Amino acid sequence: MEQYIEAFIMYLHNVKKTSDNTTMSYKRDLYKWMDYMKSLGIDSLGDVTKEHLTDFVAYLESKKFKAATISRNIAAMKAFYHYMYKEKIVKEDISDVLHAPKVEKKLPDVLSMEEAIRLVEQPSGDTPKELRDRAMLELLYATGIRVSELVGLKTSD
């Protein structure tokens, strides 16, 4: 199984051009799944059943992994089996039995009006750096843009 996981990881990196974070997360998740399969005495992809996949998800839940982590593990297994099926390494994509749990969306913490005003007024001087910082903070507050968008702005924007 390890050789197939490594081939899949190379495919993700070289063909799909996934981010390094995604690639490493999928690799870690698939090795965790492989270790679980080996603990059941399963060393061949052909011996893995749909029940084994759902049992693995139940195992993750029993270990109190968060829904987002379980969801990513499921995404990794689905992508892996889709690739294995496409490459004709397995006869059937058995991952169709897997369904990701609902991931709770947490609302972000927001500043009170007083906190926001105090933050914007922090750069209080008239140096170019302080004026820049104040303009950036006011832009963040007024528009709600992401910090990554803010730091990517050019004066021509």
Question: What is each PLM-predicted segment?
Answer:
Residues 1-157:
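Conserved catalytic core of the tyrosine transesterase superfamily
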